[in-house]
Amino acid sequence: MACTTILVGKDASYDGSTIIARNEDSANGEFNPKRFIVVKPEEQPREYKSVISHLTITLPDDPLQYTAVPNADLKEGIWGEAGVNEANVAMSATETLTTNERVLGADPFVEYTPAKGDEPEVPGGIGEEDFLTIVLPYVKTAREGVQRLGALLEEFGTYEMNGVAFSDSNEIWWLETVGGHHWIAKRVPDEAYVTMPNQLGIDEFDLEDALGDQEAHMCSEDLAEFIETNHLDLAVENTTPFNPRDAFGSHSDSDHVYNTPRAWYMQRFLNPYDEVWDGPDADHKPTSDDIPWARQPERKVTIEDIKYVLSSHYQGTPFDPYGQLGDERTRHMYRTIGINRQSQLAVMQIRPYRPQASRAIQWMAYGSNPFNTLVPFFPNVDTTPAYLEDTTTRVTSENFYWANRIIAALCDGAFRSTSNAVERYQEKTGAMGHRLVAATDEQIARLGLTAAEEAAQSAAEEEFEADNVDGDVQPMTPDETIAALRNPEVREILAAANQTMADQLKEETEKLLDSVLYTRSMEMKNGFHMSDF
């Protein structure tokens, strides 16, 4: 899918969390209604068959519970996209990437071949449709996520280029597929953020580490031979670090319209003073091929920053389709980040300063990001609110997805007259979300604790927040974490908080719909009343 990703290391985030976020955008001319659900172990398939590639995979018999954001219409498969499992591992899959002819000539995609005559069908490999479902329920750390997906890619191959993010409370990993069977993965530096449009992004890779200690790099076992045999390393000097973007990626004319401008705008917003971003003497321009994969921000990155950049339509530049700078040519020159065919945005935040059972948050938004809101939900629950889960293929304002689609369609043609109402809605619901998280954290923190335990926990949390150093207020092994999350009393509290959030969200969304519908109705061209005379 045509998506946009941002990853934020724990030392770059505002609260010491790891944060992974991605817009899921549908193909041009398509709109995919989405559902936010919990998949219980008994609901997880043991024999999985993909719709697109007709591939059947036998899955392990011990899946973890996890959240997902599948399509409401399953005619093209599940497309689970984003979730957190009960080991507090988050996964976002996938960011569709570009490649080049040299890579595909050396390792072709594994594509489905239909039956023809006496020849039986030949299943294809795995793809975005499948990734979350066949990986997230079976991993207990972010690193394990990379290892499992890498093994599946090597065994079954893939029919498309994809980027996938994994996170736990300690680290974030970014995996990029290479051709049909190869892959690379890099740990996001703790002090940095990563911006990813639909283009292979990693621009420096330590093969020695990937094939050795794997401290910050991993890859398919034969990657060094694959690179050498197929002359993929384009470095002029032997001492130059290996650049996967040059070797495996693309620098096409379409990239300069569709991809590089998005990375340029996100980094321009998060590092406005590091370099010159505009004009003929800019260090990086919207069409630059060397915009860094990772960068240290000038200040800590917040949830609101993430929502802003993933809603971007190039505000403050001549490229804003809703702006007054530039002209009609420049305003439609580049593909915006906040686009009409956005399906959903999931932001997964894993907070090391909270108890294991409630440290994960999955922030959710549906529809076109410039006109929607991002609100928090706790994934460690047995059910999700109907307002976000019960999305149908029928248009109705009774669920969050379609309400947002209707609001966006109304606001797009009257951006200036509706923008104040949208901004007030976003601010109010965002504040409600932060307030609800804080109240729920307090409730969980005091659950069943003695006075002495309360004092000790408060001291630990204050020390963590004050020092902002590596640490965990409740360090546990993965299996201990899973046991802690399977606390029915905690899950009941978190589910109640989620329902409260959904109820308040529905009320505010309906108010916004009423407001923008009134504004658009008053602007109709067939309006007429006697006071006109």
From Swiss-Prot:
EC number, as in UniProt: 3.4.13.19
Temperature-related activity annotation: Optimum temperature is 50 degrees Celsius with Ala-Gln as substrate at pH 8.0. Activity is 30% of maximum at 20 degrees Celsius and 50% of maximum at 70 degrees Celsius. Stable when incubated for 10 minutes at temperatures of up to 70 degrees Celsius.
pH dependency: Optimum pH is 7.0-9.0 with Ala-Gln as substrate at 37 degrees Celsius. Activity is very low below pH 5.5 and at pH 10.0 is about 50% of the maximum.
Catalytic activity: an L-aminoacyl-L-amino acid + H2O = 2 an L-alpha-amino acid
Pfam families associated with the record: Peptidase_C69
MF terms (GO), sorted A to Z: cysteine-type exopeptidase activity; dipeptidase activity
Catalytic site: 3
UniProt keywords, alphabetically: Dipeptidase, Hydrolase, Protease
Xref: InterPro entries: C69_dipept_A-like, Peptidase_C69
One annotated GO biological process: proteolysis
Family as reported in the entry's similarity comment: Belongs to the peptidase C69 family.
General function of this protein: Hydrolyzes a wide range of dipeptides. Highest activity against Ala-Gln.
UniProt name for this protein: Dipeptidase
Organism of origin: Bifidobacterium longum (strain NCC 2705)
Upper taxonomic lineage: Bacteria, Bacillati, Actinomycetota, Actinomycetes, Bifidobacteriales
